[in-house]
Swiss-Prot record:
Pfam families: DHHA1, tRNA-synt_2c, tRNA_SAD. SUPFAM superfamilies: Class II aaRS and biotin synthetases, Putative anticodon-binding domain of alanyl-tRNA synthetase (AlaRS), ThrRS/AlaRS common domain, Translation proteins. Keywords: Aminoacyl-tRNA synthetase, ATP-binding, Cytoplasm, Ligase, Metal-binding, Nucleotide-binding, Protein biosynthesis, RNA-binding, tRNA-binding, Zinc. Consists of three domains; the N-terminal catalytic domain, the editing domain and the C-terminal C-Ala domain. The editing domain removes incorrectly charged amino acids, while the C-Ala domain, along with tRNA(Ala), serves as a bridge to cooperatively bring together the editing and aminoacylation centers thus stimulating deacylation of misacylated tRNAs. The keyword Transport does not apply. It comes from Staphylococcus aureus (strain JH9). It comes from the Bacteria. GO terms for cellular component: cytosol. Catalyzes the attachment of alanine to tRNA(Ala) in a two-step reaction: alanine is first activated by ATP to form Ala-AMP and then transferred to the acceptor end of tRNA(Ala). Also edits incorrectly charged Ser-tRNA(Ala) and Gly-tRNA(Ala) via its editing domain. Its EC number is 6.1.1.7. Zn(2+) binds at residues 565, 569, 667, 671. The lineage of its organism: Bacteria, Bacillati, Bacillota, Bacilli, Bacillales. This is Alanine--tRNA ligase. Belongs to the class-II aminoacyl-tRNA synthetase family. SMART domains: tRNA_SAD.
């Protein structure tokens, strides 16, 4: 067998199947496009669902790809096994109703055994089949010539995910020899068993049945092939290494971890787990961020945060106690660059995101682990179970993923009360991770729309009306010839001015009518074969196929949509100009009444940045730039500097919307003819939607004017209430009122101090001597959290050589502050005092050696915390 680099295996696989007439499907982004059923692209076939279920027809029925994928259903196993990964590449060849078992098996055998390709020894290959799949057996035995002893029948060789396409599969195994598979006596030492000697290298699925709702099986009208070969696994076989982690996909990362940690890989089993966790997770995190995902508290963002925090925790077992994961990004980029240049192109941005997350987690990790260790001690002394409410508080307050708590608990021989935890999560849905369901990689084939191949031409770029013919009616999932008034119907037209929802732009609405009927059009989408599919309600009359009709788009809405879409392009360019090239579109919505634009950026925009962006967009509007729209090949578009939206896939011919020199972008939407038609642009809000993603909402034209008119009306009302005449006097009056408020608050604060002092009496009498230190530990009655600081300042001025610790209860929230004379900070640190006290009142805190503060949510435990800290000082 040839010893090949992973990149060579990938390229050979693609080249082989191109020779066999396959079309290369580029690897899609890990964040699914137009597929809400998937959290991540999790297999090679996931991006091809549209072909298998009939929504789209591929240019060629033979497809090959190398698809990056993420699976996170067994994160806790990663690091502890030889082949578990959260990120992996799946090589696959697919047939959509073209070839079937004979060719699929012959292709696989040729690729694996031919000296031109992998050069595997035929006598080291075994296969498994379904017991009833005699066709596969005969191909392997009679046509390929595989001995019967190397064909194993296994009942589980049937691919079935429930309702939808299903069928038998055959798996191919490579015998690595007696040197492998002796580590565990429990290993099932045969092809198809759990062992390290006979490794599965390829799975061929023969999709030939439809699993119906009643659990019966019927033959599919189109039989399909879906295969999968894990690149990491095949690399381990080709390079003859024990695990995937010793391949050239991982070893450069391992070498860098060795340099940072000073530890060696493959010397200590426990440390090896940490090496594997870090190496796997950094690949996942780097690729996910490069494809548009960002750490967050829910959904796919939570997965990233969980992976990063898990890797950080394991890095501590290697003695790494500072942010370092971001330093591995360049290594990942170099390894994967030949096929995935995107990671290298976005490396700086990826590193900034990771470093920011690492720094945030390191801030809370120490406190969180300290609390968890206390919970473990408590559980070991009682029920051997960590209380679910405590686990939830750890998650909610300290950002500790529950999976991390569970993993640490298991290592300590404990379990977590997940029932109570889930109950707490349910009560705080806004903080919960987004619920997910395992998605199916294919759907039941819909033949109705797939079989409609007649052309439908979109003419809406040039007109909002058309005389046309109604060609197809779909009612209740079936194609019909007529539909009555009051019914909801789907239909197609030979020519249509209605834009189908796409690229963030909403669909047109309007009417389709003649003298006999009228349909109010509410939605327009794309059918599998590319036609615009209209949805509407029959207002009156009887609709018949073949009718000549007038199609009219709501022109007022269309004009507003055009303005907002062109303004979105100008906004995108302005954001890049003001904030930097790291800005990428993360989502958009273009409607008639507003536009919304999501983009990648750290932190809120300043008012000055918002003003700059707004001014830039309006300047381009007022310049009256002609909007030049052309169709051209993708290479020409890139050459002229057209910006492609990140994550989008484009065909050979693209549409370029040119507002040069300010904005040139690929887009299929509807736009104004000149930027002056937009009239006016006004940003109404800038907010965050998740870590690293900001959102701008804006108005154009008349809507922007009405918004400004409303603001002016409110300003005039405020001017009247302030009893001033000119606009300039408003600011002066406001400043005057603020100064008066500050003076009154200062008087009130002084009065509160005097009242507190009267209540406390002579504070010198309350000072205790503990372990040789003068200490004042007390609860104070103050009106607000801010007042405890001023009280501390007052006490500190009177007791300059005293350790002072104050706590207060304001509105059922605990505030605490500690101060230590600088002469004592070598022995006693204020930050340590607060860190010890805060968990007792259900909170956290910290600070400098001489001054620290904290808070909590359990005022009933204030006395307990004050007693505790006295004992703590006593034992220093």
């Amino acid at each position: 067998m040839k010893k090949l680099k992973a990149s060579e295996i990938r390229q050979k696989y693609l080249d082989f199947f191109v020779e066999k007439g396959h079309m290369v499907e580029p690897s899609a982004p890990l964040v699914p496009i137009d597929d809400d059923t998937l959290l991540w692209i999790n297999s090679g076939v996931a991006t091809l669902k549209k072909y298998f279920d009939g929504r789209e027809t591929p240019k060629k029925p033979r497809i090959v790809n190398s698809q990056k994928a993420i699976r996170t259903n067994d994160i806790e196993n990663v690091g502890f096994t030889a082949r578990h990964h959260t990120f992996f590449e799946m090589l696959g060849n697919f047939s959509i109703g073209d070839y079937f078992k004979q060719e699929a098996i012959e292709f696989a055998w040729e690729f694996l055994t031919s000296d031109k390709w992998m050069g595997m020894e035929p006598d080291k290959l075994y296969v498994t089949i379904h017991p009833e799949d005699m066709e596969a057996y005969n191909i392997w035995h009679k046509d390929i010539g595989l001995e019967e002893s190397r064909i194993i029948r296994i009942e589980g060789n049937f691919w079935d995910i429930g309702e939808g396409p299903s069928g038998p599969n055959t798996e191919i195994f490579y015998d690595r020899g007696e040197a492998y598979g002796q580590d565990d006596p429990a290993e099932e030492m045969y092809p198809g068993g759990e062992n390290e000697r006979y490794l599965e290298v390829w799975n061929l699925v023969f999709s030939e049945f439809n699993h119906n709702k009643d659990h019966s099986y019927t033959p599919l009208p189109n039989k399909n092939i879906d295969t999968g070969m894990g690149l990491e696994r095949m690399a381990s076989v080709s390079q003859n290494v024990r695990t995937n982690y010793e391949t050239d996909l991982f070893m450069p990362i391992m070498n860098e971890i060795e340099k940072v940690s000073g530890k060696q890989y493959l010397v200590n089993n426990e440390q090896d787990v940490a090496f594997k966790v870090i190496a796997d997770h950094i690949r996942t995190i780097a690729f996910a961020i490069s494809d548009g995902a960002l750490p967050a508290n829910e959904g796919r963002g939570y997965v990233l945060r969980r992976l990063l925090r898990r890797a950080v925790r394991f890095s501590q077992t290697l003695g790494i106690n500072e942010p370092f994961m971001y330093k591995l990004v360049d290594i990942v980029a170099d390894i994967m660059e030949p096929y995935y240049p995107n990671v290298k192109e976005k490396a700086d941005f990826i590193k900034r995101v990771i470093k920011s997350e690492e720094e945030r987690f390191h801030e809370t990790l120490e406190d969180g682990l300290a609390i968890l260790n206390e919970l473990i001690k408590k559980a070991k002394a009682t029920t051997n179970e960590i209380n679910g409410k405590d686990a939830f508080k750890l998650y909610d307050t300290y950002g500790f993923p529950i999976e991390l708590t569970e993993e640490i608990a298991v290592q300590a021989g404990l379990k977590v009360d997940m029932t109570t935890f889930e109950s707490e999560m349910q009560q705080q849905r806004d903080r919960a991770r987004q619920a997910r369901q395992n998605s199916q990689s294919m759907q039941v084939q819909s033949e109705v729309l797939k079989n409609i191949t007649s052309a439908s031409t979109f003419v809406g770029y040039d007109t909002a009306t058309a005389q046309t013919t109604l060609t197809h009616l779909i009612y209740n999932g079936e194609e019909v010839s007529q539909v009555e008034a009051g019914e909801t119907v789907y239909f197609m037209l030979t020519e249509t001015p209605f834009y189908a929802v796409s690229g963030g732009q909403v669909a047109d609405t309007g009417i389709v009518y003649n003298d006999n009927f009228e349909i109010a059009v509410s939605e327009v989408t794309k059918a599998p074969n590319g036609q615009n599919l209209h949805k509407g309600v029959v207002q009156f009359g009887q609709v018949n196929v073949g009718a000549t009709v007038s199609a009219e788009v709501n022109q007022n809405d269309r004009r507003d949509i055009q303005k907002n879409h062109s303004a979105t392009h100008l906004l995108h360019a302005a954001l890049k100009s003001v904030l930097g090239d790291h800005v990428n579109q993360a989502g958009s919505l273009v409607e008639a009444d507003r536009l919304r634009f999501d983009f990648s950026h750290f932190g809120p925009m300043t008012n000055d940045e918002i003003d700059q962006v707004e001014r830039l967009v309006n300047e381009e509007i007022w310049k009256g730039i002609d909007v030049n729209i052309q169709e051209m090949d993708i290479a020409s578009a890139k050459e002229m500097g057209a910006m492609a939206l990140f994550g989008e896939k484009y065909g050979d011919v693209v549409r370029v919307v040119n507002m040069a020199p300010f904005s040139i972008e690929l887009c299929g939407g509807i736009h104004v003819r000149n930027t002056s038609e937009i009239g006016l642009f006004k940003i109404v809000s800038e907010s965050g939607t998740g870590a690293g993603v900001r959102r701008i909402e804006a108005l154009t034209g008349k809507a922007a004017f009405l918004y400004l008119e409303d603001i002016q009306e409110k300003f005039n009302t405020m001017k009247s209430q302030m009893k001033v005449k000119s606009d300039d006097q408003v600011v002066e009056k406001l400043t005057q009122l603020q100064d008066e408020e500050k003076a009154l608050l200062k008087q009130l604060e002084q009065r509160d101090k005097e009242i507190t002092s009267l209540k406390m009496g002579n504070i010198e009498d309350q000072v205790e001597e503990i372990n040789g230190y003068k200490v004042l530990v007390t609860e104070v009655d103050v009106p607000n959290a801010k007042a405890i600081r001023s009280t501390m300042d007052d006490f500190k001025s009177k007791l300059q050589d005293t350790i002072i610790i104050l706590a207060s209860n304001v509105d059922d929230k605990v505030s605490m502050v500690a101060t230590v004379p600088k002469s004592l900070t070598n022995n006693v640190k204020a930050g340590d005092l607060i860190k010890q006290m805060a968990p007792i009142v259900g909170g956290k805190g910290g600070g400098r050696p001489d001054m620290a503060q904290g808070g909590g949510t359990q005022p009933e435990n204030i006395s307990k915390s004050l007693s505790f800290i006295k004992d703590y000082i006593k034992n220093l």
